């Protein structure tokens, strides 16, 4: 958790002051002071950091410290929906419900009554007079005494003693019982009046001539009734709710209660002493239940709508992101749920800064839904994320353009969309015309002289001559890119991740300048760097803003430029190894450049790689070092053995890193060479068991065959090369002319079908490993007749062929022995020549060899 909760803050503290205080221990991404609706501080807040480590350091440093004179306490903030928070919330709710229940209400009301009685007693003791209660029995008695006629009043009645007598009645416990009985009688009278209202309206009218005599008012003489209760008895229509009446009628009310029914009512009252104070049916509760159900249904419909949008688009809209968050960080945050196609961060057009928003597109909409469920409201670099479904803009664009786009426009748009995917062209693809123009301009001859068969005693095939020219241009291009800080090995990681800011511009016409390329891409955003090799056949463009680079890629891909079509491809990640922020554009003249010497290959196979490779070790003086730490480098191993006498070299065996194109990983072992065998023996005894980088070394003498085998497999040190994707029109002579430029060939083989056509692959074998390696480095990006030659080492194929030959020889020996034993068993029978399958296959193989020899002679 990278978010902290800070308690005990001063009430006057501001957000800026809180941010400044906590910025001492890391990069603060969010500050939130909690306030009341009136704006006053609640004296606690939240602080977010970029990483959990920074948050933990701030917690250890600031906890129980002071801001001004207030001591603060800090804890790691809980996530939304945490079980502990839910449990605490339920406990508080239960305590409130317990305090608001019947018993709690009664106890609260009793306490209030006692407090009121106490205050009245204190007031009476202090003043000697008692203030009569409003609406109590005193006011009613005063009213009745005043309203009585003088004939009925007693002349000697002492009116001053009335309040005191009434107070005694109130204090007497019998009054509560009388009030309760009066309340029951009131309810029964109300129920009877409500039930007989209709009957009285439709009943026969009494004799009009007879005058009804008024009945005596018994309630007027009942001193136990209050003013409100008396007035309620005299009202024709009941004011208030009829819930009590409905409940009484549902239980079978009668016009006049019998004794048994009265007993039943008394029993019901005894069983539920609070029934007369509480309504039987709570219409408010039912309304609340209906409202809650309606809100729950609306929430479910809204959630289902969000799910449908996510499943349709597979795209999420993220809010409240840190402004410093990068696309790679967001990608790493969401890629645990599935494959992320794209992360788009909108930027401000003026400042090029993030707006705190992002769009994340998933390959599978189910993965997007899982990310929405898990990460909505989660903490990312100290901020609480808010996730929403995003609309698929590609679908909207397709819907708007389907009606107006022609077939040609639709195909062009499809090509642009496919350009963002895995590109099928070679990374160093160059236009054949540009290659010929570059070589002709450099040599000062016409292009026809370059392509003229047999010119200057060269190859007779124009395709081979053009392929050789392309090979030369590619070597110069690779050297130029290496001088500019480009990782050339990254071009081999075709299936690795691609950069969103570096673009390879291919198939550009010869003579294109860096200014023209910069102007072409500058229409869509800021251009940081443009690299054009001396040949002028390819360009590397770097744009610092990801969104602008994506826009330029979509706009320029397959665009016509100077009579040609531009092919764009995203460069591999790690291509620019020495990139500097804000570096000026490198404007290289198309023809300016120094060509390389092809006789000096860049890779030396025979000598040991790594530190100290310039010295040569004698045979049998190489040590094999095991149990090396994966963090140990060649320099570290060299420094460890450099103090020994006759030290020659030290290297660590490595392999390509599949996650980082162009990088290599240690294999945990290496080799150390010495100039003499005696020095190697001394070093083996001295260094065996030593500790290097917390690892105990195991030092033994290297076996030459094992070392050669390991070197051959790891570095591709073989003399035979497998050539794939060969044109079907290519002949053995074309392959020989192309590959013989890199060294002396021992054999060239093109497997053919039964109709004597090639099968699209072949084999070439050199005399030495150095020549084979030189050919591999020089020709792996070359095109022949428009096809990219795919080169691989064939040492695995050779080992497989050896196993097949051994199995064939065993099978042949088995059948020969069986035939000889049968002939010895019955010598009288005439022996017949029988060929088994192994012999037949051997005969076919021999015939093919003879036919290949004839082709070589031709």
From Swiss-Prot:
Main location: nucleus
Localization terms from the record: Nucleus
Alphabetized CDD domains for the sequence: RRM1_MRD1, RRM3_MRD1, RRM3_RBM19_RRM2_MRD1, RRM4_MRD1, RRM5_MRD1
Keyword match Ribonucleoprotein: yes
Low complexity bias spans: 191-204
Gene3D superfamilies: 3.30.70.330
Pfam families registered for this protein in UniProt: RRM_1
Compositional bias (Acidic residues): 256-277
Entry GO MF terms: RNA binding
Alphabetized UniProt keyword annotations: Nucleus, Repeat, Ribonucleoprotein, RNA-binding, rRNA processing
GO CC aspect terms: nuclear speck; nucleolus; ribonucleoprotein complex
Annotated TM spans: none
PROSITE patterns assigned: RRM (PS50102)
BP GO annotations: rRNA processing
Residue ranges constituting the RRM domain according to the UniProt record: 2-79, 314-392, 501-573, 621-704, 719-796
UniProt KW Translocase keyword: no
Stored SMART domains: RRM
InterPro entries referenced in this protein's UniProt entry, alphabetically: Mrd1_RRM3, Nucleotide-bd_a/b_plait_sf, RBD_domain_sf, RRM_dom, RRM_MRD1_RNA_proc_ribogen
UniProt region (Disordered), positions on chain: 87-138, 150-169, 178-229, 241-280
Cited PANTHER family: RNA-BINDING MOTIF PROTEIN 14B, RNA-BINDING PROTEIN 28
Function: Involved in pre-rRNA processing.
Family, per entry: Belongs to the RRM MRD1 family.
Protein name as catalogued: Multiple RNA-binding domain-containing protein 1
Gene that encodes it: MRD1
